[in-house]
């Protein structure tokens, strides 16, 4: 009975560990940056300075679409065109303060406020 129990425990333990590893790998750390921490963090991370605190630079390729919002998705088919566009460009209205102080943000979101390398 002891050997059977160990085998059964292993059959449960291995898939559980694999699932845990996959879940941890997909988690991206978020942070809240308020007060002096926000401009200090931007200054340290952004080599060429950072953009205005009210909006980020527009990315002409994807027009700041929300990550994971695919064209012709079920949500898009259910909503009207204006609702879809509002969802896609929601972040255009929010500034770094809205994203990183009122809510928490990821490092990738902070870096999107960095100014581009100046053209020479």
From Swiss-Prot:
Main location: secreted
Gene Ontology molecular function terms on file: hormone activity; insulin receptor binding
Keywords carried by this UniProt record: Cleavage on pair of basic residues, Disulfide bond, Secreted, Signal
CDD domains named among the record's database cross-references: IlGF_insulin_bombyxin_like (cd04366)
SUPFAM superfamilies: Insulin-like
PROSITE patterns reported for this sequence: INSULIN
Tissue: Expressed at a high level in seven cells of each larval brain hemisphere that may correspond to neurosecretory cells.
Pfam family, one: Insulin
Disulfide partners: 34-101, 46-114, 100-105
Protein name per UniProt: Insulin-like peptide 3
């Amino acid at each position: 009975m002891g050997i059977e129990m160990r085998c059964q425990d292993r059959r449960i333990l291995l898939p559980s560990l694999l699932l845990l590893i996959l879940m941890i790998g997909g988690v991206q750390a978020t942070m809240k940056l308020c007060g002096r921490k926000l401009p200090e963090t931007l200054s340290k991370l952004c080599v060429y300075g950072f953009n205005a605190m009210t909006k980020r630079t527009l990315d002409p390729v994807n027009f700041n679409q929300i990550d994971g919002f695919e064209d012709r998705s079920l949500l898009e088919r259910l909503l009207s065109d204006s609702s879809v566009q509002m969802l896609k460009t929601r972040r255009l209205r929010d500034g770094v303060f809205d994203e990183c102080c009122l809510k928490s943000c990821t490092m990738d979101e902070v870096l999107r406020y960095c100014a581009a390398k100046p053209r020479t």
